[in-house]
């Protein structure tokens, strides 16, 4: 039978990964310091754990820990000196907030945290640090048919969650079936807000990053095949509903996941201000980033001010993106491109074979669609941005050799693999769309992935 967890007052009950800190002492200027016994963290210390792994491109410098001032995440400084200076982070989409800094170091059995509060007294404000990796997530897989309704879920020290690795979020069904997450406010995750992703597989865990055994793409193919041996069937995994949630200010993604979100419905959510701090960069960042969105419906979501809006990567088979409003999913002109960051668009469909139906959406950002895929039908959309990288990224050039990205396709409406193939291109259909030319004052410049270049 279904188990329901419900806040008696909408958004009244809070499930948090953070603890309030009131033992700050003035260190220098605007910088205060506190000492936290490492026993508080148990076997996971966010202030010694880096955001890093496969498909992470922005360097190994940011930790999963975070400091919050009045529910806003502070920026991590690379040194105590940088924390004291409190200079603007030139990549931030919200530069006025980027002067609030923190820096942590270890001293024996204690974590020492310095923070620049720009003149505020942290003992008189609401100041928290995240200490827990997740907020609501079963330790074991297969805990199915739960409803989580009406909670505020916030401020967890989540880890970078690429497709060939264990994936966590502040709330996650953890490789199970039939969850309903509804009417929640989900915010201030260091990485992912909601994760519909992958279980821990010790033999497929960041192997490219830490063992250099196979390419990340091959590890993803392995993940699909190994998933068959770990219960990846329609009867066991997926069929979740995420509805009417306000998901914001998470730095990897609002909703992410590989394989565990199949047959799900994601509807009527407000997803916004994702990755606006621009501290994290890599190929897993978007309002929603789903691998293997088999028979997934993205419906009536309002997605804006995200690095990308909806990103369906691999196996977007039977996927429908319908009646969504997407706008302002683009880097502001004043912000520099983060080294390791990605280009921006409303929708990105990548190395899939379809069918992928994109219909009745309003796409208002500078770039509406990025297509490195086949088998897309785009119908009845209002399209106010350009298309970009059409067909690009379907192959990889490795050491001067073309390595085709061959990806799986599945028995219709199932997870069982039918085969693998390369992208043949050309099998895309466009019917009855309205294209609006914005007539920019200057020619539209498409930002590159990972550098400050343009086309």
Segments predicted by a language model, with ranges:
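Extracellular polysaccharide-degrading/modifying enzymes targeting complex plant/algal/animal polysaccharides
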Residues: 1-175, 180-187, 193-233, 408, ...
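Glycine- and acidic/polar-rich repeat regions and solenoidal domains
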Residues: 158-174, 190-455
């Amino acid at each position: 039978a279904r188990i329901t967890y419900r806040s008696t007052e909408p958004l009244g009950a809070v499930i948090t990964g953070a603890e309030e800190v009131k033992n700050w002492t003035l260190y220098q200027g605007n910088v205060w310091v506190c000492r936290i016994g490492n026993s508080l963290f148990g076997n996971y210390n966010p202030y010694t754990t880096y955001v890093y792994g496969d498909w992470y491109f922005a360097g190994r410098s940011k930790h999963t820990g975070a400091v919050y001032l009045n529910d806003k995440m502070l920026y991590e400084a690379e040194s105590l000196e940088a924390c004291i200076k409190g200079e603007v982070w030139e990549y931030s989409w919200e530069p006025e907030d980027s002067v609030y800094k923190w820096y942590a170091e270890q001293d024996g059995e204690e974590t020492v945290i310095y923070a620049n509060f720009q003149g505020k007294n942290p003992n008189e404000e609401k100041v928290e640090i995240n200490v827990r990796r997740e907020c609501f997530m079963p330790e074991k897989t297969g805990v199915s048919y739960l409803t989580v309704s009406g909670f505020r879920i916030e401020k967890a020290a989540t880890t970078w969650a690429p497709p060939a690795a264990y994936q966590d979020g502040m709330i996650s069904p953890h490789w199970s079936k039939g969850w309903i997450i509804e009417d929640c406010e989900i915010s201030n995750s260091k990485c992912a807000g909601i994760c519909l992703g992958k279980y821990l597989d010790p033999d497929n865990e960041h192997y490219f990053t830490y063992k250099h055994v196979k390419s990340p793409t091959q590890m993803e193919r392995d993940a699909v095949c190994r998933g068959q041996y770990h219960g990846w069937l329609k009867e066991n995994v997926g069929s979740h509903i995420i509805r009417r949630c306000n998901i914001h200010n998470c730095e990897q993604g609002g909703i992410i996941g590989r394989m565990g979100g199949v047959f799900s419905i994601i509807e009527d959510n407000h997803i916004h201000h994702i990755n606006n701090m621009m501290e994290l960069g890599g190929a897993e960042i978007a309002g929603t980033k789903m691998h293997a969105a088999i028979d997934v419906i993205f419906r009536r979501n309002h997605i804006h001010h995200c690095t990308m809006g909806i990103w369906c990567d691999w196996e977007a088979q039977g996927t429908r993106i319908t009646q969504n409003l997407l706008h302002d999913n683009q880097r502001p002109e004043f912000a520099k491109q983060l080294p390791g960051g990605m280009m921006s668009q409303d929708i990105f469909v990548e190395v899939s074979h379809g069918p992928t139906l994109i219909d009745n959406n309003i796409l208002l950002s500078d770039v509406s669609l990025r297509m490195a895929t086949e088998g897309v039908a785009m119908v009845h959309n209002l399209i106010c941005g350009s298309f970009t990288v059409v067909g690009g990224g379907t192959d990889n050039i490795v050491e001067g050799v073309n390595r085709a990205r061959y990806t799986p396709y599945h028995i219709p409406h199932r997870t069982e693999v039918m085969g693998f193939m390369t992208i043949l291109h050309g099998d895309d259909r466009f019917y009855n769309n309205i294209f609006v030319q914005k007539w920019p004052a200057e020619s539209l410049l498409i930002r590159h992935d990972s550098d400050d270049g343009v086309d």
